[in-house]
Design a protein with these regions (language model features):
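N-terminal ligand-binding lobe of clamshell/alpha-beta domains
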Residues: 2-401
Length: 401
């Protein structure tokens, strides 16, 4: 039996087990509490949602966990509690929760209107103005992610580090396990199921997906040549070119062509490697530098040139075209909104890349900054929260047509 069939069999068996506990013994006349709205997973591959009459089951394919979500006004909620290596139960809608903000995109909560139920975060460098506002106002507390006793006070703790030992109230949300931008964005439905706001999650994802696909179709229809793109990073004397499917999908959908290097890493202390790296960069029109920077504000074009260690740059058309970029335009200290807002709104990333590849000059970038032009990151602060924190944040729709 292959893994897909096995997963379906396990899910059906689990649903049958829960149905037995929920409906197997009835004392007199009972009222049925039904699940109100539904989410269907369309694109993501690492989670699935199954619905019963008074419960839901979310299966996480990354860590093998099944989350049994029990409606708070159902009989089963008061008499059932699971905390095993494979099954955990939660009473929903969650009354409060915390999040490991080093690995969990809080932007999903903003789109769902759940910020005021967020009561704890593990870092105060989160790239959300409204989360920072609530934290500054004392409505959210900062937590030690290793203090399980402190984390246990919440109905759930959302985190994305699969290497961390989970406690009974931990729910693993791992959009970063997905290979495409839309697959990652669809994890809003995972969060929505814990709060009974599937209809809102569906609405947000549909809006984002339609805008993304429209932009991708426009980019595909361009008749001009596809720019060659080097998506690269530097670490300890070695440059490498990305092979990550997530980035490749963005480049493809924006109308670019990723650099096809013979090998993946180039050591600048090796003359042969340096010469080959030099030659390769002479063939590209766009460079996206994703080198990790603990101080993004001071990462400039000079930093890139110094790391490159190439004296003759006369053939670099990406410099002639002023097309040297980083995706750290929006930051909070050393944290990048690329790992928060960009996850829930990939249409904005795609629109940025289309402008990078086919510049018009009349578009304002959201996530990318131009190193050649000396653009610096924008530091996100609580004063930038200009809306009611209890309201839902609508996705930004990029004009497409």
């Amino acid at each position: 039996m292959d893994s897909a069939h096995c997963s379906w069999f396990q899910a059906l068996f689990f649903l049958a087990l829960v149905w037995f506990f929920n409906c197997g013994s009835v004392d007199g006349v009972s009222t049925t509490v039904k699940v109100g709205n539904f989410s269907k997973v369309e694109d993501a591959v690492n989670f699935h949602i199954y619905y019963g009459q008074t419960f839901k089951v979310i299966k996480n394919a990354v860590d093998g966990q099944s989350y049994l979500l029990l409606q708070n006004n159902s009989r089963i909620a008061s008499r059932t509690k699971y905390c095993t290596s494979r099954i955990k139960s939660f009473v929903i809608p969650l009354s409060n929760f915390s999040a490991d903000t080093d690995s969990f995109p809080v932007s999903f909560l903003e789109h769902l209107g759940l910020l005021e139920s967020l009561k704890g975060i593990t870092s105060d460098t989160v790239t959300s103005p409204c989360v920072l506002k609530l934290y500054k106002g004392g409505q959210i507390e900062k937590l030690n992610k290793s203090d399980y006793q402190m984390l246990a006070q919440f109905s759930a703790h959302f985190f994305g580090d699969t290497d961390q030992q989970p406690a009974c109230n931990f729910a693993t949300s791992v959009p970063f396990s997905e290979d495409t931008p839309l697959q990652r964005a669809e994890w809003i439905k995972f969060i929505g199921a814990f709060a009974n706001v599937e209809s809102r999650a569906n609405q947000v994802y549909t809006t984002v997906k339609e805008n993304y696909l429209c932009l991708a179709e426009i980019a595909k229809s361009r008749t001009s040549f596809k720019p060659t793109v080097a998506w690269m990073k530097y670490n300890s004397g070695v440059w490498s070119f990305t092979k990550e499917a997530y980035y490749l999908k963005y480049v493809e959908d924006a109308g670019g062509e990723i650099l096809d290097a013979n090998k993946n890493t180039y050591n600048i202390s090796d003359p042969d490697d340096l010469e080959e790296l030099h030659a390769l960069l002479c063939t590209v029109e766009v460079v996206i530098d994703e080198t990790l920077a603990y101080d993004p504000v001071n990462y400039t074009m000079s930093t890139f040139i110094q790391n490159l260690n190439v004296e003759d740059r006369s053939c670099f058309s990406f410099l002639t075209n002023t097309s040297l970029w980083r995706y750290d335009k929006r930051i909070q200290s050393s944290s990048l909104d690329w790992y928060n807002g960009a996850v829930s709104q990939p249409q904005l990333v795609l629109a940025d890349l289309i402008e990078v590849f086919f510049p018009t000059g009349n578009y304002t970038m959201t996530y990318f900054r131009n190193l050649f032009k000396g653009e610096t990151p924008i530091n996100i602060g609580p004063e930038m929260c200009d809306r009611d924190t209890s309201s839902t944040l609508d996705p930004t729709i990029v004009p497409c047509g």
